[in-house]
Amino acid sequence: MVVRKGKKSRKLQGRTRTMGWGRVGQHRKSGSRGGFGAVGFHKHKYIWIIKHAPNWYGKHGFRPRSRIHENVTINVGELDELAWRLASNGKAIIEDGLIVLNTVEMGFDKVLGSGKVTRGLKVIAREITEEAKRKIEEAGGKVILLEELEAGSAT
């Protein structure tokens, strides 16, 4: 094959009407690419969607703030410190030798198991991890879940 000395675009410049694209109108507007923009994504360009943008359709994005609820948590170590502070101020509620901490009234949803428990606590909680429950009971404390309280008061 003969090597082309100049570019095709330079050769065609200024002297041809169709610039090597056949009949007038071929390659002129958006018909050659199947329409402008996102046209045909559910029709003739669907294979492109499957290959390059599989998440194009469907719901994505933000959830309403009113629907999102993040658990507010507290560790047993922090509860122990809080109990010590309340006891030293004389504001602690004591039942059967245990300092009562109602985490639901404090605004916490869940009690986690990080930290040490050094005194007997009676913890009322909405949710609690196994580790936290074990640590509180090993220190001579007691755990009461809110469900148990509500079930007990209903009967």
Curated annotation (Swiss-Prot):
GO cellular component, one term: cytosolic large ribosomal subunit
Record-given protein name: Large ribosomal subunit protein uL15
Described purpose of this protein according to its UniProt entry: Binds to the 23S rRNA.
Swiss-Prot/TrEMBL GO biological process terms: translation
Similarity section: Belongs to the universal ribosomal protein uL15 family.
SUPFAM superfamilies registered for this protein in UniProt: Ribosomal proteins L15p and L18e (SSF52080)
Underlying gene: rpl15
Biological source species: Desulfurococcus amylolyticus (strain DSM 18924 / JCM 16383 / VKM B-2413 / 1221n) (Desulfurococcus kamchatkensis)
Quaternary structure and partners: Part of the 50S ribosomal subunit.
HAMAP family per the UniProt record, alphabetical: Ribosomal_uL15
InterPro entries, A to Z: Rbsml_uL15_N, Ribosomal_uL15, Ribosomal_uL15/eL18, Ribosomal_uL15/eL18_sf, Ribosomal_uL15_CS
Statement: the UniProt record of this protein carries the keyword Coiled coil: no
Pfam families from the UniProt entry: Ribosomal_L27A (PF00828)
